[in-house]
Curated annotation (Swiss-Prot):
Residue stretches of biased makeup (Polar residues): 140-150
Keywords, comma-separated and alphabetical: Acetylation, Metal-binding, Nucleus, tRNA processing, Zinc
Annotated region described as Disordered, given as residue ranges: 121-150
Residue positions where N-acetylalanine is found in the record: 2
Record keyword Acetylation present: yes
Record's protein name: Ribonuclease P protein subunit p21
Length: 150
């Protein structure tokens, strides 16, 4: 289980703004300006406090106009093939900016990989300990530097 989260109130505020933008668009799809304001405020708070947002949240926000991207309502979503790979192309209907996302079932985001978790990084031990440079004569230090650079 994860430990206590730093800036818990800030993450709760970001979550509230994101949910409020979804609520506004679901109740009244014409009120995109208010939803855009909520999303822009969310991005500003996250940037000011240097907080990392989940990639799934960032993918649902337009990078230029801060609109909430909901397929069929505020954006179009198409499947394309390019150079043998499948891509999902989202185009914002407000500013016409498009984003491409790799559509590969085998692809894992870095945050979802096991080696990205802090618990797993602490368990990894180097195969052999590094020598203490203060204990070695200068000739050995130079030869070790040459061996490691090769």
């Amino acid at each position: 289980m994860a430990g206590p989260v730093k800036d818990r109130e800030a993450f709760q505020r970001l979550s509230f703004l994101y949910q409020a933008a979804h609520c506004v668009l679901s109740q009244n799809p014409e009120n995109q300006a208010l939803a855009r304001f909520y999303c822009h405020t969310e991005k500003t708070i996250a940037k000011r406090l240097v907080l990392r947002q989940d990639p799934s949240v960032k993918r649902t926000l337009c990078r230029s106009c801060s609109s909430l991207l909901i397929p069929g309502l505020t954006c179009t979503q198409r499947q394309r093939r390019r150079k043998g790979q499948r891509w999902t192309v989202q185009t914002c209907l407000t500013c016409q900016r498009s984003q491409r996302f790799l559509n590969d079932p085998k692809h894992l985001l870095w945050g979802d990989r096991p080696e990205a978790q802090l618990e797993n990084q602490a368990d990894i031990n180097p195969s052999e300990p590094l020598p203490n440079i203060a204990d070695l004569p200068k000739e050995n230090i130079q030869t070790q530097a040459l061996n490691t650079s090769e």
